[in-house]
Amino acid sequence: MLINRNKQCIIKNKYSKGKIKVYTDNMIVGYPIKDDGEEELNEILDNVSEYQFNLALEGLFVRGGVSVGDFYINEDIVFGPALLDAHNVESNLACYPRIVLDDKTVSRLQKYINNYDIAPQKNKILIDNDGKWFLNYLNRVFKYYTQCNNQYEFEKMQIELLFKHKVKIEEMLDLHKENIRVWDKYVWIANYHNYFCNINFENEKELRIAKNKLLSWPRGISNNDT
């Protein structure tokens, strides 16, 4: 239900050329590009980031892959090498709740970035410890400026959204604390959250997730264990 409700983040209106296909808990997005594809790729990265952000605020942390290449989608079928590439990235490289770009997409972005002194794409993407480029979806908190009457309202809205994001992560950490494989994925998202807040909201200490929540502590044997 959440996936369907937030689809408009990606396909904004009936005039959009993008197409979406949803099945079970998966979503496929196809978007045509022209010329060098910079405008379209920027748009789809923004829209998918917004979609990912909205789902995260509801406690649904998703992973995915982005590829560029030949692809066909209609109401009945989807196929093409770009679909296989994106699926491979999602299945084998994303690992954590992140949307990872494949090598072809990274190459395009590198070309775009080199055309600017201050490239707009740099705020859309982060590079993880394993070298993978992934969507910096929390950067979407900065889109709300035009919806606020002044800077104070804007900052207040940003902090409220990030605090909600923090709470959802903490809920997941607590829920999965006895399943180390799942819990580790939320540790990753917590570290991403803290990184973003440290860089952009250094003075808002209440937005940080405490480090002791991100460690797996051993304990002694209690009466309840015997």
Where are these regions (language model features)?
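Catalytic NTP-binding/metal-coordinating core of nucleotidyl cyclase/transferase enzymes
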Residues: 1-53, 57
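A short glycine-enriched loop-to-beta-strand structural element that forms part of the catalytic core
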Residues: 21-30, 60-74
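A short acidic (Asp/Glu
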Residues: 32-33, 74-81, 110-113
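Residues that cap or initiate secondary-structure elements
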Residues: 35, 72, 105-107
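Catalytic-core segments of nucleotide cyclases and related cyclic-nucleotide turnover enzymes
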Residues: 38, 42-45, 52, 73-90
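Short, conserved, surface-exposed binding loops centered on an aromatic residue
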Residues: 54, 91, 125
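Catalytic/regulatory signature loops of cyclic-dinucleotide turnover enzymes
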Residues: 57, 63-64, 68, 85-103
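Intrinsically disordered, glycine/charged-rich C-terminal tails and inter-domain linkers
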Residues: 96-226
